[in-house]
From Swiss-Prot:
It comes from Homo sapiens. Residues 38-117 are annotated as: Disordered. It is found in: Nucleus. This is Oligodendrocyte transcription factor 1. Expressed in the brain, in oligodendrocytes. Strongly expressed in oligodendrogliomas, while expression is weak to moderate in astrocytomas. Expression in glioblastomas is highly variable. GO terms for biological process: axon development; neuron fate commitment; oligodendrocyte development; positive regulation of transcription by RNA polymerase II; sensory organ development. The gene is OLIG1.
Amino acid sequence: MYYAVSQARVNAVPGTMLRPQRPGDLQLGASLYELVGYRQPPSSSSSSTSSTSSTSSSSTTAPLLPKAAREKPEAPAEPPGPGPGSGAHPGGSARPDAKEEQQQQLRRKINSRERKRMQDLNLAMDALREVILPYSAAHCQGAPGRKLSKIATLLLARNYILLLGSSLQELRRALGEGAGPAAPRLLLAGLPLLAAAPGSVLLAPGAVGPPDALRPAKYLSLALDEPPCGQFALPGGGAGGPGLCTCAVCKFPHLVPASLGLAAVQAQFSK
């Protein structure tokens, strides 16, 4: 019996100890929250013990914000500037422009140099075509206004040089066979064909004399030990028939320039 009465008192203590809520308590709590800075006052259900769990869940889902933070206006967005280093370095914005200008100037120089190189190459090829084309059978057969390509011009020049070399070898052999053991020296100086090799070129076999023996001349100079030009009658031609000369000038008339006559060449031989 005593135990039952004690248990009833223990169960009834929380209900008797709770003070009943008055109407002014809700307004007082709202004014206190306004003074602290929170806009949302606590709900009336938070005062009762039955709605304690619902209030805690609502406070966790919707946190209270200070009044000053909610009423503070947002600051306007600042326009993006040229960069943080633009104030410290006044010429920072001009540096990319100067670098780009330098690159453009370098590109112009490279283009002009390449253009000049191609122009020089075209001029050289045109000069080579002027020398080679008269000896080109393909050009004579083709269209007259058509220009040979660069590779065709170079191949034709190579063949032309090889042909000239073989002709030179044949000339040496002919001079060596026709002159005999006492072969005269045929010296060429200043010819356009052999302009790349300065000095005199020995065509006929024989030792080269001292430098003072080689007289410089603008055109062909011949030093022959043969007698002056003399003709002998062909066999069966009669006394008044045409004669044949055996000197080197008459044998190779194409080596003597047209500006020099036979008398001038013979006068030069006698010196």
